[in-house]
Amino acid sequence: MDSISFSFLLYEAYCVALYLVLPTVPSPASTRPCLKPLHRDVVVRTSWSVFLPAAFLFAFIDMVIDPVALRGDRWFLGKIYYYPDPGIHSGVPFANYVGWAVVGLISLAIYFPLERRLPALTPPQSVTPRLLPGVGLYYGVLVFDLGVTFWIDESFMGMSGLLMHLSVIVLLMVRLAGPHGLSPSG
């Protein structure tokens, strides 16, 4: 994979991690938007609670991308690479995923101190609209790769990729549009 793709996938994974972790902005019951407004908090944005999930999500999406890319000769990608010692995960060695996680951790370790030093902006109260494109791209890549996986008749590989990501998808959906908090009924 080229270095630009790494950057985009890391940005997308970072957006998903932020969406899962950033605090919500309280809003009156009468003006609640359909998507939860998230507060831009530089301390949270550059904390371990974002750092580790972002690196994990970066390597996690590769667990769907690489097995189908390895079979590029069966679809329009073509045979672009191979592993001399195929791994147990659909032919991809585990070291590949460790490498992705390490690249993600190093990249974020460089970015986070820079983010903390940037001058404070006066962004809108909610950063939800700014995160949605990254979240959408992450899941767009996932849907594309799963679609190709099923299209080339790799049903087991496709189902395992779907099931691996299902828990994160459910958490994200609850976070995106789930209950805005319990209100006392009375």
List where the protein language model places each region.
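Aromatic-rich, lipid-facing transmembrane alpha helices and their immediate juxtamembrane interface loops
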Residues: 1-186
